[in-house]
């Protein structure tokens, strides 16, 4: 008995010491200030400053944000299609109830490993030259949650084009939108299927081609200098999609909600229902992210960006979130990035939204679904 008590004390002491160390790390970043001169840097000067003044992540010139746009800041920052990254007062009135669950939260979690049957979780899409991140973050997480709710039986890709072009309450299409409004639209109006431009599958595939975002020459054409105009809302499927009509192809949500701006609340929701849409503030240095755990180090604020949260972990004592971006697979860590967790870095823990698929609609589809996959590596 004494031995067990002694061992228990050791475990508790180790746990407390670990938490104390973690808090001291977080305090360092929570209370930091960005040097005023660093905040004004851009281009090679900013990249050099980032790489010389911290060791959590590396910066590298990204072709899309340098040679393509150059000084056209309006076009460059137009890709950041979220005006307000934090949940509004109204958005906080309807929060996920998973925050009240009694769950053991692991040190690390990855949706790709937890739900291996769901191919959509692994997919990186490309928003091209359109400020449609708010729509991509939404349909990506919705697609994942449909698969998870159906225990891997329904593998679908919801259409970013359908949401982007037809949700008038969401905002301004390629000029930005509201993530929570996108999830509410899913509940009220439903969203049809639609793959990326290259795969060209589903009812409404994405209308804009992938383009070169990156630091080295790729097989994609350079991104257009200006943003694409918002597509016209077409409430019909493309001509070569004959599986279902537009209305028959829709998937609906049962609920849409915000998630409390608390690390454990976010983790519980992610563990329970799957990937989430999150928004955060993008600074100039983030555009040049090439790997590691991102912390804002320099450069000016450009705008708000929406992405898909899939997990978390710790790297050499630094806690992070794992996130899927929509700038293709050659950006960052194969299209993903990691960002400091626990200090609301760039507001990333203050604008988390999600929802639940409408289960009765999923059940009826399971009886006639043929497991048609619409994923393609050629994004």
From Swiss-Prot:
Gene3D superfamilies: Cysteine proteinases. It is an enzyme of class 3 (hydrolase). Belongs to the peptidase C1 family. InterPro entries: Papain-like_cys_pep_sf, Pept_asp_AS, Pept_cys_AS, Pept_his_AS, Peptidase_C1A, Peptidase_C1A_C. Residues 1-16 form the signal peptide. Transmembrane segments: none annotated. This is Cathepsin B-like cysteine proteinase 6. Disulfide bonds join 118-147, 130-174, 166-233, 167-170, 203-237, 211-223. Keywords: Disulfide bond, Glycoprotein, Hydrolase, Protease, Signal, Thiol protease, Zymogen. The active site is at residues 133, 305, 325. The gene is cpr-6. The keyword Nucleus does not apply. Glycans are attached at residues 196, 201. Residues 17-104 form a propeptide.
């Amino acid at each position: 008995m004494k031995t067990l008590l002694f061992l228990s004390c050791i475990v508790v002491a180790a746990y407390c010491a670990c938490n104390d160390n973690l808090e001291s790390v977080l305090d360092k970043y929570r209370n930091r200030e960005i040097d005023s001169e660093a905040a004004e840097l851009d281009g090679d000067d900013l990249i050099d400053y980032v790489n010389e003044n911290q060791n959590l992540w590396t910066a590298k010139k990204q072709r899309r944000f340098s040679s393509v746009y150059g000084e056209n800041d309006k076009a460059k920052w137009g890709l950041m299609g979220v005006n307000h990254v934090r949940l509004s007062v109204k958005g906080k009135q309807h929060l996920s109830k998973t925050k009240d669950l009694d769950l053991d939260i692991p040190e690390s979690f990855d949706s790709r490993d937890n739900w291996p049957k769901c191919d959509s979780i692994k997919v990186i899409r490309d928003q091209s030259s359109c400020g449609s991140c708010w729509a991509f973050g939404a349909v990506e997480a919705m697609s994942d949650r449909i698969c998870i709710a159906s225990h891997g039986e329904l593998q679908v890709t919801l259409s970013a084009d359908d949401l982007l072009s037809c949700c008038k309450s969401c905002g301004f299409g390629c000029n930005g939108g509201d993530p929570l409004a996108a999830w509410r639209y899913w509940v009220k109006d439903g969203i049809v299927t639609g793959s990326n431009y290259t795969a060209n599958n589903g009812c409404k595939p994405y209308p804009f081609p992938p383009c070169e975002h990156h630091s080295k020459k790729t097989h994609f054409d350079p991104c257009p200098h200006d943003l694409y105009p918002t597509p016209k809302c077409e409430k019909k499927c493309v001509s070569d999609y004959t599986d279902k009509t537009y209305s028959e192809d829709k998937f609906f949500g049962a609920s849409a909600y915000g998630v409390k701006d608390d690390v454990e609340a976010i983790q519980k929701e992610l563990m329970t229902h799957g990937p989430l849409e999150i928004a955060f503030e993008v600074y100039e240095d983030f555009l040049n992210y090439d790997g590691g755990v991102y912390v804002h180090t320099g450069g000016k604020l450009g705008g708000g960006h929406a992405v898909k949260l899939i997990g978390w972990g710790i790297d050499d004592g630094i806690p992070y979130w794992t996130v899927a971006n929509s700038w293709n697979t050659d950006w960052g860590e194969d299209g993903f990035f990691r960002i400091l967790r626990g200090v609301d870095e760039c507001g990333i823990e203050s604008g988390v939204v999600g929802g639940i698929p409408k289960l009765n609609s999923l059940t009826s589809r399971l009886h006639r679904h043929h497991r048609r996959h619409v994923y393609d590596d050629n994004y």
